[in-house]
């Protein structure tokens, strides 16, 4: 689907390869509806974080949890994609995932706090 070609994860991977020190936050698990391609191109990069906004409704809970673990829990931020989506629903979808309480707390705030403080 060419509508999403500008958010194709390989484009971001090329930028990150060209500028290795660049810190990047990629929305929608690195590429909306291209989640497998996203983690194939982007997972394992220590200077990349993804958010889970506007994605959890379209993934089965175990698929979403698998994506989170592929990127690494500490590399994932909670995002609501407000005003497009209801933050309460996005939060409920995150809390319904098969994740530990500690993993959820990391995604909800700890990871972003560390990122803002330069610790992430």
Name each model feature, range by range.
Residues 72-77, 84-120:
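Mid-to-C-terminal alpha-helical segments outside catalytic/metal-binding sites
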Residues 1-77:
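Catalytic pocket-lining loop regions of alpha/beta-barrel enzymes
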């Amino acid at each position: 689907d060419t509508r999403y070609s500008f958010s194709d994860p390989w484009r971001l991977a090329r930028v990150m390869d060209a500028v290795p020190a660049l810190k990047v936050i990629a929305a929608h698990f690195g590429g909306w509806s291209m989640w497998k391609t996203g983690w194939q191109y982007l997972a394992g990069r220590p200077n990349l974080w993804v958010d889970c906004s506007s994605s959890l409704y379209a993934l089965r809970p175990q698929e979403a949890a698998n994506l989170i673990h592929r990127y690494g829990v500490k590399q994932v931020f909670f995002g609501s994609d407000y005003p497009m989506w209801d933050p309460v629903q996005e939060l409920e979808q995150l809390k319904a995932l098969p994740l530990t309480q500690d993993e959820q707390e990391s995604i909800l705030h700890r990871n972003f706090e560390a990122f803002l403080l330069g610790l992430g």
